[in-house]
């Protein structure tokens, strides 16, 4: 049985919200603030009593060592790195490979250096793409085995962050939030009367950005031990095709309009496609042991669709 206790030392919790009316809990730098998770963090952090500063490209490039070295870290308590190059297929191209390694490895190296030098807590977002997907359930102790450039660059960035004494490496998967995402794409197809072919042999659970942000805030305020945590939605394990069928049904269409296919069938004849892990299911025992209860992803999907329809 896998050990559920993180290997790092106990974290130092920031003041709990509400223990002194009006007291701020700390200043947080959020990188990748314009992304799905970044937007959720910028909304929820102030509600939890934090003062967040959000940065993103092109104004701030975390892979620029000189810029990060000259950044005024005075007064910051936490860095949350939600910045990443996430174009999985694009990372397989010569230019994409360079951009992926720059954002996903060099950037975290620079942030880890700053965190160590200034005594900050670094929260870094990772992905199930650091695994090959051959294991049905991924624990925090699983050895990285990335299949493509994106996963390789993320695994290297994770390694850099892991040497930071005060770090939370948060591994997640299948994120849904503000902006373009799989659920919105399927809903658009349903509304236009399109019957899609959707991959059925890749399995996992959706993670809603607001729930992911809430889990991160829990880690930095609860005194949870530093180290690696899996954090995704909970509930039934589904395929992309299963989720698409649920979207079609909620939109008033027949789920039979969605045709399940294998990954190999879906990408047949296409070039430059990155390999995907077939299992994206994360073991959530460790994050639950800290007192955080991940939301049921199917229930959250229903609520999300109600808001969209």
Tell me what each language-model feature is.
Residues 215, 222-272:
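Mid/C-terminal beta-alpha module of Rossmann-like enzyme folds, strongest
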Residues 187-195, 206-234:
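Alpha-helical substrate-binding/gating segment
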